[in-house]
Amino acid sequence: MALFVIGLNHTTAPLALRERIAFAPSELNHALPELQNSLNDPDDTQANQPPAQLAVLSTCNRMEVYLSHAHEHKHPERAILQWLATYHDVPLSELTEHMYILQGESALNHAFAVASGMNSMVLGEPQILGQMKQAARIAFEANTMGSELRHWFEKSFAVAKDVRTNTAIGE
């Protein structure tokens, strides 16, 4: 499975754009399955390929789609960008100008930095870990969190705990 993070944050996008593409937690129960369906190829279902696994972290300072996808070569990041632009009625060109796309080890390292507060506007702020846990719970409830993505999130939570325990971050 290929791991991706597609998103924007306080360093890449102005507040006005972040507000336009933010999701309310209650909105994600419907939006996550819709996004998952847009990523799943009907041929994959027939070939017993696993569906895309995804979660969305949406806060005042960031919106990120965390994705575990079976087909690295199919460029799911393009489909996600198009879906986000359509869903939020934002021109694709405006959205892509401010988005980042991370894959593999870079995506995993980013998740570790976010969970531990190292990628926050205020270094070490503790709320982000709770927000990531909420994103994982919502994805689980929406049935878009599979074992691969769950493992990725659990590893991020463990790294965040280690960072808080073994460093002075957030003090």
Which residues does each predicted region cover?
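A glycine-rich (often HGG/GG-containing) alpha/beta subdomain
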Residues: M1-S120
